[in-house]
């Protein structure tokens, strides 16, 4: 018995218990028993409430799952409103529950061209919504169930180049100055943005590449796309000329919107002269539509800031017919000229295109370059292809200097025939 009291004293309650009488101890014990019973009943009540709440949550989850069954009705968010019922209190007996709600409300327009006001937005957080968003709503209650990805024209999505081009700067001969200018205007602002910030200069918004056909404009754009990790959108000028009014301008808007979403990105517009010709008075609807498409392009070039990771590369071989508004500084800031290759460049181009061929050591590229006066880069490549076909025709295992000379004669004959044909 003494050991029990010693343990109690060790617990810090011994002195208090020793001073109490037996009746007081019995009374205290009864009080503790009643408190324990009350606590047990409280625990039981809370457990029942918890189970009831879990059942309710499960029931609501099942209802949400039923409501979220596809298909959704596609809608657009028109406006988001802050509603406070205290601002519009009026005397009256009839009080609508929805009118007493506080917080964000939404106005949506469905694909059936009906407009609805939603006092309860739905399962999407109001902070994540903004006017113009595409959402999926329940076809009966019109509650917003999910946000949908932004809708772009399927033709614009097809413009995105998924497979990277394989060209490299080393595959381009005689264009060292042009490569450096393009890298400074397009690649450096994307990969080394801090260099421009340290100097406090604004990088160019875009680049215009111009020159005769076959001088390597598109080839250099493909090499630039291969060397950067940016999204590459390739537009052709004739693609933007559409039959319906406003269709071409919408393509331009969607292309720039997609480029902004997937930034950093490069937009390459080939054959810019298809839509960028000088404006003139015309009564034909087709001419006016082309001019509207160009005006939308001008607007988009002015719309994004230079520090945004969206760059434009345009290419044309008729810079003389382009509208002056396209050529002014602030839109296509840097103009890069692609001249006809000189003798050294022609020799380098033929060397590049002969790298993978089985070529005899006696081939003199400098002499070949002297024989190909007024040839552009594409014709120099055609000489290499023709030389290979001539060697194949005679059953040779390697290309000789004579094969290249015959290839030059073949290309010159085609060139003269083409000139006579167009004359």
UniProtKB/Swiss-Prot annotation:
**GO BP: any one term:** proteasome-mediated ubiquitin-dependent protein catabolic process
Where does the UniProt annotation locate this protein? Cytoplasm; Nucleus
The record lists its disulfide bonds as none
The alphabetical list of record keywords is: ATP-binding, Cytoplasm, Nucleotide-binding, Nucleus, Proteasome
Binding positions for ATP per the UniProt entry: 211-218
Signal peptide location: none
Q: Name one Pfam family in it.
A: Prot_ATP_ID_OB_C
Among InterPro entries, the record links this protein to: 26S_Proteasome_ATPase, AAA+_ATPase, AAA_lid_3, ATPase_AAA_core, ATPase_AAA_CS, NA-bd_OB-fold, P-loop_NTPase, Prot_ATP_ID_OB_2nd
What GO MF annotations does this protein's record show? ATP binding; ATP hydrolysis activity; proteasome-activating activity
Q: Keyword Cytoplasm on this protein?
A: yes
The Gene Ontology CC terms held by the record are: cytoplasm; nucleus; proteasome accessory complex; proteasome regulatory particle, base subcomplex
The main location class comes to: cytoplasm
Organism superkingdom: Eukaryota
**Function text:** The 26S proteasome is involved in the ATP-dependent degradation of ubiquitinated proteins. The regulatory (or ATPase) complex confers ATP dependency and substrate specificity to the 26S complex.
Subunit comment for this entry? May form a heterodimer with a related family member.
Family (UniProt): Belongs to the AAA ATPase family.
Q: What is this protein called?
A: 26S proteasome regulatory subunit 6A-A
- Gene coding for it: psmc3-a
